[in-house]
């Protein structure tokens, strides 16, 4: 019962709607009141204005002096300076060339940053250092001094005086050798300069001599104990052995550094 009433009312509403709009859409389309589909075509003047650029530059207003000169008649033959400059200006100047960054941006390339990145600012430019000396090389200035020390024997190269040269019968020190006194100060300076490089060589002659004296300490002490100079040398070797002595390696005493023996202890 209820459904039939709802259906009848719906049909009645549809009939009333059809009667109210009967023929009106056709009349509105013919009269131009109905909005037509599609984009509207602008008139010719609007198209010409759009092609000329937007906004279109209008006429510039001349200054007041030029306006007064044009309105005042008769006026003097020679116009004032402002009017002459205005007449000589002509069309507006062309636009200036854009900067390089703007041109690169327009071409699709990112501009190069003028400031270098932080890592390049921290590090200084690479410097060319002098080549380091190899272990088997020695400075050119100390070559002559090194040859002289090697020619004097093991005791002269190590800097420890021999027992026979310094110990006499009366126990006094013997005078220095004449070839030592003949050395110049320059040779001594070059010898002192070249000594650190020789000390770094574990296979050098001086290192082997020092190692032999430390191993045979008792023998050196017995030989040099006869005189005052010899006793001083023995005491020096004894103190050096005490300073450099360690727990030992294969029954041998180690030197101060522990690398000249070559035993790897």
From Swiss-Prot:
Residues 196-206 have a biased composition (Basic and acidic residues). Pfam families: ANP. Residues 24-30, 44-50, 64-70, 81-87, 100-106, 118-120, 126, 132-241 form a propeptide. Residues 153-211 are annotated as: Disordered. Changing residue 80 to A: Important decrease in ability to enhance AsS activity. Keywords: Cleavage on pair of basic residues, Cytoplasm, Disulfide bond, G-protein coupled acetylcholine receptor impairing toxin, G-protein coupled receptor impairing toxin, Hypotensive agent, Metalloenzyme inhibitor, Metalloprotease inhibitor, Protease inhibitor, Pyrrolidone carboxylic acid, Repeat, Secreted, Signal, Toxin, Vasoactive, Vasodilator. It is found in: Secreted; Cytoplasm, Cytosol. Disulfide bonds join 249-265. InterPro entries: Natr_peptide, Natr_peptide_CS. This is Bradykinin-potentiating and C-type natriuretic peptides. It comes from Bothrops insularis. The lineage of its organism: Eukaryota, Metazoa, Chordata, Craniata, Vertebrata.
């Amino acid at each position: 019962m209820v459904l039939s009433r709802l259906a009848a009312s719906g049909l009645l509403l549809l009939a009333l709607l059809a009667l109210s709009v009967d023929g009106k859409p056709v009349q509105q389309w013919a009269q131009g009141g109905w909005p037509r589909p599609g984009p509207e075509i602008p008139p010719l003047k609007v198209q010409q204005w759009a092609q000329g650029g937007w906004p279109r530059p209008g006429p510039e207003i001349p200054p007041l002096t030029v306006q007064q000169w044009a309105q005042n008649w008769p006026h003097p033959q020679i116009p004032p300076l402002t009017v002459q400059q205005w007449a000589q200006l002509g069309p507006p100047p062309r636009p200036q060339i854009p900067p390089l960054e703007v041109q690169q941006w327009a071409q699709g390339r990112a501009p190069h940053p003028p400031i270098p990145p932080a890592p390049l600012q921290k590090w200084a430019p690479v410097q060319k250092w002098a080549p380091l000396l190899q272990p088997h090389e020695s400075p050119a200035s100390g070559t002559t001094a090194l040859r002289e020390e090697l020619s004097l024997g093991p005791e002269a190269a190590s800097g420890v005086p021999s027992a026979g040269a310094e110990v006499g019968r009366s126990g006094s020190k013997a005078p220095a050798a004449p070839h030592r006194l003949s050395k110049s100060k320059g040779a001594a300076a070059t010898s002192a300069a070249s000594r650190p490089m020789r000390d770094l060589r574990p296979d050098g002659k001086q290192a082997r001599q020092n190692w032999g004296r430390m191993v045979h300490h008792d023998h050196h002490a017995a030989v040099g104990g006869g005189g005052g100079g010899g006793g001083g040398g023995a005491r020096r070797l004894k103190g050096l052995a005490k300073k450099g002595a360690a727990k030992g390696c294969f029954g041998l005493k180690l030197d101060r550094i522990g690398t000249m023996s070559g035993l790897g202890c």
